[in-house]
Amino acid sequence: SFQLAAAHRLARDLIDAAKRIGEVPDPMWLDVEKRLPLYTADYSGIMLFKGQRFVESHRHHSHMAGLYPFDTIDFSDPKTLRTVEMTYRNWTRMGMGLWSGWCVPWASIPHTHIGNAPAAVFMLHAWDTFFTNPGYGSRHDVYNQGLSIMRRGTNSGRFTVAGDAPGEEIMQMDGMCA
């Protein structure tokens, strides 16, 4: 569904650009908008691609690219709205246990798009609490346990306390930029 959303965003932008400069849009761009589906979906919501359901909430939310960043999904259609609702419910049900740091602020955006401001704000606070180090640097691995298992030292099954996992040191080398 990511590629479908990207193709639609590109086609729409090319059509719009052509009109703005007084050109006729390429028929291929119009054909993409006419015949290419916006996404693939089943009863569970938007799928990763045709035949592949979203079965594990991991480090990216690309199956929802039609919501963000491409903004190609129109909520005014009741069937589409139901699909988005099922997608959101399924994504929420899967949880954040396999998420990495950079996808947490990204998750704030779909919450914003559907009007769930408290969840959007929570994601930003969660990112700050669990995925930034004491110097406020963003991390891939969780800095504090309890939200995700994406942590060096714990993914191998060894439970660690804060500061105990390998690679948790904070250092700066002269001449190196952050």
Indicate residue ranges for each PLM-predicted region:
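Active-site core of glycosidic bond-cleaving carbohydrate-active enzymes
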Residues: 2-177
